[in-house]
Amino acid sequence: MRLLFVSTPVGPLGSGFGGGVELSLYNIAKEVIRRGHDLQIVAPAGSRWDNLPIMQISGNLQIIAQSLERETPITMPSNPLLANMWDYVRQVESEYDLVVNFAYDWLPFYLTPFLKTPVAHFVSMGSLSDALDQIIVQTSKRFSGTIGFYTPAQAATFPELTSPIYYLSSGIDLSLYQFCSQPKEQLAWLGRISPEKGLEDALAVANSTNISLKIMGKIQDESYWQKIQQDYPNAPFEYLGFLSTKEMQQVVRECRALIMTPRWVEAFGNVAIEALACGVPVISYSRGGLASIIKDGKTGFLVEPDSVAGLIEATKGLNQINRQTCRDSAEKVFSLEALGERFEKWFVDILNFQS
């Protein structure tokens, strides 16, 4: 197949501003190339990824959906990057069999009927916007099988979707993550530093248990970051910045557990499978797609949402988790090969539907 991937417009690939969908796009791209498909990626200027074919487009970045209210009207900045990216798609679509949209934004769905080449939409978050909900539902009805999600829990946040709905999960290059059987007395927290990620609860755990917390990720909300540090002045933590996969796994693999504290319905949680690949159990609120990744009591613990006491209690049970079981779980379900099979089947099905 000749595939055109269109990235998120909230930041350059490799910057971390796109969150988990950046890693998903990267891994899917690597796997479809390995499978012999022709691929071009359309992405914001400044995107940097090793040896992947990227057409860089200039323009002003789109505001991330998480920062907006549900009722906020659809808007774009002047010289909008999102519109510029899709104008490029319009110019070159005839050269491709399928366009794959990774942007969680209204415009690509709206433009779908005006393009001659079929468009697959990989929806990377749960419901956040009334206007976006409406057009996703309309697209699922009008263009059968073109909407894909990470998990059923994520898809369930959208009303009245039309079948078939594709649940594609995620996957990683397991060779990049080294197993560690003997961790240090430390915990990890990994993700965008933004209110919906609930980092303050992980700091509360560190403060209560006196176990050092290693924090990694892009600071997306500086005022929030400053406030939670002030709220927990004595919590033992170290902020390490936004790290490459190689650097990140070197830290995570030496931790007793990864703590995940989402305030919202996580569509998936790529950092969870990255931790499991290192043999690191995951302690998480039982919310969204994370409940489909973590096997409670075997590869980590699922805790009542927003219960810091539950997180603290779970840290006491980490010795009963076999870290090899965590690694085995990642290898069985979340390999690049399995990811490639799921996406390739989806792409073929769409082309069959459209024909």
Which residue ranges define each predicted feature?
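Catalytic cores of nucleotide-sugar-dependent glycosyltransferases that transfer UDP/GDP/TDP-activated
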Residues: 1-354
